[in-house]
Amino acid sequence: MKKMVQIKYKEVKTKRVNDYETTFKIEPLERGFGSTIGTALRRTLLSSITSVVPFAIKIKDVDQEFDTISDIVEDVQMIMLNVKNIHLVYDENIFEDNKIYRGVIETKNEKITSSDLKFPENPEIEIVNKDLEIATNNGQKPFVMEVYFHVGRGYISFEDNKKLIEEKVALLNSTIKRGKFLAIDSDFSPVEKVKVKVQEINSSSLNIEEELEIEIKTKGTIDTKNILSQAAQILIAHLQVIGDVKNLDAVDVFEQKKQEKVEPSIHSVDITSLDLSVRSINALKRQGYTKLADILTLTEDDLVAVKNLGKKSVEEIIQKLKEYNVTLNRGEK
């Protein structure tokens, strides 16, 4: 295989805003590779990066999303919309797959924001947008709400999250006695914007070469270097399956395929499983025929010649073999 020019990957310092908004450059790429790589990375960045988001809430004395709450300006639906925008710093050392994380708001503050959200079981969890307004309390009673988070990627509708609540209700550990769990949509994408730019570059090469610029802005939950690395790893994992043709079983980045039950071969079936008469079974066993595979070596003439097998017994055996879609040769004419 003809070798390609070694490429370089770097951050464009002049276009850097912070860890969560910057631009990366890859060059030199052979003609066409800029668009190919850029499009694949962009789609993966927008759809397949892991993060942690809310999937359910529980408000004291609230049973459905159409309720209103005494002294609270916002209705329940508006509160749910606000909660969806709570962003947590995603740290793989803190958050585990298939685990539920409970946040609690209990305050008499007039302006209730995401900074009022506390994690009793996981105090190390950090909130990105602490000034996000959740609700307005015009009364003296405390506003009490629990928010439940989990790890995932892509998008999950509130209907699917309803099912998740039913499955995980025992793990939610709610301390609110009056009120019901309400599901909300989960948009896991930590990316706000991805812009891909491809242009030709002047070089000493005789071939036309390109540079690829990828501008990324996240929601502040994961830094841009990490999500770009994660996107590349996802693509590599898929392409490795194609490239590593001789060692497909060694690729373990995908979920394990459920093992299908393998039916035993009919050749290994014991003759006692054929539901034959005792006379027929004994006659066959005396001649050393204990498996269906043994019988399949015989012709009909051989079967007739077996000692103590009468005409009816032979017909019985032939009929049973037909149930296994097996027929014996008739023998020499």
From Swiss-Prot:
It is an enzyme of class 2 (transferase). It comes from the Bacteria. It catalyses: RNA(n) + a ribonucleoside 5'-triphosphate = RNA(n+1) + diphosphate. SMART domains: RPOLD (SM00662). Residues 1-246 are annotated as: Alpha N-terminal domain (alpha-NTD). Its EC number is 2.7.7.6. Keywords: DNA-directed RNA polymerase, Nucleotidyltransferase, Transcription, Transferase. One of its GO terms (cellular component) is cytoplasm. Disulfide bonds: none annotated. GO terms for molecular function: DNA binding; DNA-directed RNA polymerase activity; protein dimerization activity. It holds the Pfam family RNA_pol_A_bac. GO terms for biological process: DNA-templated transcription. Residues 262-333 are annotated as: Alpha C-terminal domain (alpha-CTD). DNA-dependent RNA polymerase catalyzes the transcription of DNA into RNA using the four ribonucleoside triphosphates as substrates. The N-terminal domain is essential for RNAP assembly and basal transcription, whereas the C-terminal domain is involved in interaction with transcriptional regulators and with upstream promoter elements. Belongs to the RNA polymerase alpha chain family. Homodimer. The RNAP catalytic core consists of 2 alpha, 1 beta, 1 beta' and 1 omega subunit. When a sigma factor is associated with the core the holoenzyme is formed, which can initiate transcription. This is DNA-directed RNA polymerase subunit alpha. It comes from Mycoplasmopsis pulmonis (strain UAB CTIP).
